[in-house]
Amino acid sequence: MTKVIGVRFRQAGKIYFFAPGKYHIEEGEHVIVETARGVEYGHVVLSEREVEDDKVIQPLKAVIRPATVEDDEREAKNREKEKEAYKICLEKIAKHKLDMKLIQAEYTFDNNKVLFYFTADGRIDFRELVKDLASVFKTRIELRQIGVRDEAKIRGGIGVCGRPLCCATYMPEFVPVSIKMAKEQNLSLNPTKISGVCGRLMCCLKNEQDTYEELNSKLPNVGDIVTTFDKLKGEVSSVSVLRQRVKVIVNLDNDEKEVREYAASELRFKPKKRVDKALDKKSLKELEELEKLEKKEGKSHINDD
């Protein structure tokens, strides 16, 4: 077992482990640590604890020091400097006539590097832009191309649910999502209904997937023939996944039919087989394209791994 603390460098960012060393550090404090891109100012989100050795990437770096008042002030000044750096970079992009969208400027704590995050369709030759920026800032410059999901994570926003975006509030990593999840949850397969503000399949499709898989496994499909606890046979007309209730058109003795509602546990039926929703070709193509784009972009490009 290894003693560590967990540190984040941005809202909803990936959590990195560091050795607390001689310091006693509590959750909510700030620390100065050495990272792959230099000395950084981080927020402690996991207090001291022991984790299994295989969960720690070696060599495990130790905390340089808990953040001082001077460190806090320096970090605040860096955030102000980033606003000016953003404006300057926008001007330089326009000057060089580059087809790229600047998303964020970020200083490392020690000012050893300025990172500029951007989105673009395809590859961009920004070598001359880097030289121009280096002559202005007199420090190392890194331009990092990110995807539209990273853009949403950085900028934030409000989802169709009316709540702040999942990726910008609590998700440290993007989760793989697929059309299958929308089908499993019986959601509308209209691409505009299940796409987030980033234009990709909504990350929240993953949130309830395991629950829906378990609940759906206990239900028949619409159209299945079932036997009820009171010895009646009938055809399933609708199901309520969360309530675990099933409406059945039962056959009565006098050749009449009647719609009755039962608990899923009151029915006997064959093991469920997947019945996919019928989709028009246009919607199916759009959904498949969204799924391909999500897989292509993969993990976040904001993190320094």
Describe these PLM feature segments.
Residues S240-R260:
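Basic/aromatic-rich interaction segments and small domains that mediate binding to polyanionic partners
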Residues M1-I15, I194-N207, D253-D255:
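Short, basic/aromatic beta-hairpin or loop at an interaction surface
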Residues G157-G159, R163-T227, G234-S237:
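Conserved glycine-centered short motifs in functionally critical loops
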Residues V259-D305:
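Intrinsically disordered, low-complexity linker and terminal regions at domain boundaries
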Residues S237-S238, K272:
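Mixed-charge, low-complexity intrinsically disordered segments
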Residues V33, T227-F229:
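A generic structural signal for residues embedded in beta-strands
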Residues M1-S188:
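Acidic-enriched and Gly/Ser
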Residues K14-Y16, E40-G42, L232-G234, K257-R260:
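Short beta-strand segments
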